[in-house]
Amino acid sequence: MKEIKAIIRPAKLPLLREKLRSIEGFPGMTVSKVEGCSAPSLQSPANLKEELTDYTPKIRIEIVAPDEVCNSIVDTIVDNARVGQMGDGLIWVTDIERAVFLYKTVPGATGR
């Protein structure tokens, strides 16, 4: 299992959601409104103060998915959320040691 997190531009969410849902085996996602700024080293000195004090609205997507669909999900995010400018966002993938889906779990069956 993998956890895929992405920070994207809000305007990209509707199309991205549609494309992700068309992936066979797509498990669903959690979407949150967040704010962020680019790294200071990526900014010109003229824009640095404004960029560090004026956060930009973004969307964070979180997906827990089987390994088999991870690359398809990441590729779909890149293909549909990128505009080629600073501030496009970020994607990161981490290993999940264990995931317990509440609706599938029998009480007491998790080995606590």
Question: Positions of the model-derived regions?
Answer:
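Positively charged, small/polar-rich N-terminal and surface patches that mediate targeting and assembly
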Residues: 1-112
